[in-house]
Amino acid sequence: MVFMPQATTSLRSVSVLTLLTLGQIGLQFVLQLLLAKWFGTETDMDAFVAASTLPLVVSGLLAGSLASAFVPIYVETRERVGETVAWSMAVQLVCWLSLFTLLLWQVAKHLAEPCMRTLHPGFDDEQIRRTAELFETLSSLMVWNSLSGLARAWNHCHGRFAMTGFAALIGNSFTVALAWRGGASGGMDKIAQAVSIGALVTFAMQMPWVQIFSRGWPVTKESQTAVKRCLMLMLPLLIGLACNQLDPLLDRYLTSPLPGSISQLGYASRLAAAVLTLSASGLAVVAFPALARHAAERDDDKLRAEIAAALRFLTLLLVPVVVVLVWFANPLIRDLLQRGRFSAEDTRVVSSTLAMLCGLIVGGSLGEISAKVFYSWQNTRTPVIIGLLGFSIGAALKFQWVQPHGLLGLAAATSAYYLLNVIVMLGLIALRLGLGIFHGVLGTLIRAVIGSAAAAGVGWLLLRTSLPCPSLWGAAAGGVTLLIVLVLLHDDVAWRAVRMVFPTRAQKARS
């Protein structure tokens, strides 16, 4: 009785955030279309992908570790000591992170060329020079993305999920508009500037500037203690997230001697990351404060129910995603990207690599929720240890497989260690909470497989038609078919989604 209303509320919040995330991904995809058309997989595109990797790694490391430590400490501080102390803690962390990342940005700009030379040994001198030029612009992402991640976590603690999604939507709109305006004539330099400006806009829109300057942030002993606790909880996360965040740097290092491979892997990785974000990010964001609250209350029944609901939701999303990417990646990439300087060979390589990254999508989605469970227990060491072991295995496999198998070997190694990590984490959670965390997952899996098979059949039929961009028509028709089959099979998540859109009709139909 307690769980179902909460699950309905979570689904509504997840749906709103997922729709906003879908808008962001749509804009990011427009940018990918422009890049594919104007630059394909040529050397300038290699330079852009290489230059953006380190800033994204650093900002992802700082934002991910600090945000994951911030949420449980902020929620606990607000509940036990008061909202004023929690507010002061948050503003102090924003100030410290601003100072640290601004200093890091300036140091990185001055060391741009030696840094790029070390990270990309396969580049010649001209490629190193060009990559360093772009890196000087893109290195500002270390500041804006890190601060944006902390601001996002702060808003999520107050349930302001739509605000953060809307801010990212506006920021991506700025990036696409500026790239569209200047990219064709100004080249990759204008693209880099557009990306940096978009990140700044996203951060600026999420901060409560008026309240900060009007309310201030009284520094007290309690708030300083909360800041120290947050930083101490963050330290193990830095090590653990370093594994995931350093993974792209290792990939760039291994592929730098292969012309075009960095760009091809970049396209596939960004598409996989977009799918991963769409499938898990909204759910993890909404569920994390609830998980932290149940853990703080030591209510294992509610915690178990929240985890089971999240796993059922992810199962319903991931099964059709895997079906689409394994069987229909090639026609999708062909219809979406193959134009301008993006060739048929690029389509073949990118689609094969994307299909091989399905393990990353599944493991990353389930791992996002699993890690949040440990963080809600204020246990950051266990995910770190698992991540270190998994990354070590993955790195060894990459060095072993890159020579005989190229990009496919790298993608397979990445998928393997992501899946290994999540299997271990879910196993440990089940040992502590019991098999109740998997309640209803098997039934959801069966329904998702049946629905995905029906959707794949419809998509295959449309691929054989003469429609323009048949894969897109097939994806749309397959999605509708999947929803219809799930409703007919009385899947609870599907019915709740229908009730959200048609509340009166859905209740009458089910009664």
Enumerate the language-model features and the residues they cover:
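Membrane-embedded alpha-helical bundles of multi-pass transporters/translocases
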Residues: V2-S511
